Amino acid sequence: MKSVRLAAFAAASLLFTVSLPAAAQNDPFMGGDYVSVTGVSIDDGHYMDYASFLSGFYKAQEDFAIKQGWQTSYEILSNVHPRKGEPNLYLVRRFKNMPDAAEGDRRQAMIRNQVKMDETQMQAASGDRAKFRHVDSEMLLREMKWRK
């Protein structure tokens, strides 16, 4: 009796193992680009302060990332009619894959060299912006592409 139950369990396990690849073949989607979305709110009276940062330092950094092939695009979206508690802006970045730790460190070093700032200076600048700019949300999404 014990061997019959064991055989039945093994057969059921095999059934599930075989059906998983079949289900994957039927999935009409495959993963595409990753999309990073950061929701940012800006205190009243500080729009131009943050807009100046975005049009200078931020734009240069994002353009550098595209030139290096690290990301495919970026955009800034304005929340035209934000409800209470919603961000004013969404910073959107698209990229093909996630770097491993070593590659991430290499990229950070290249960015610091490009902007001529060390980590302490970059953190201090971020802290200065945090007086009027607040990161409300961060999402990492993945594009769902149709299989052909």
Where in this protein do the model-derived segments appear?
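Bacterial N-terminal signal peptides that target proteins for export
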Residues: 1-10
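Short beta-strand/turn micro-motifs at beta-sheet edges
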Residues: 24-28, 77-80
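Short, solvent-exposed mixed-charge patches
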Residues: 147-148
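An amphipathic, aromatic/His-enriched active-site/gating alpha helix that lines ligand/cofactor pockets
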Residues: 26-29, 60, 64-72, 94-141
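N-terminal signal peptide c-region/cleavage motif recognized by signal peptidases
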Residues: 17-21
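N-terminal, post-signal-peptide region of Sec/Tat-exported proteins
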Residues: 43-90
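Hydrophobic pocket/interface hotspot
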Residues: 38, 50, 91, 101
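Acidic/histidine-rich, surface-exposed loop or edge segments in extracytoplasmic proteins
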Residues: 30-45
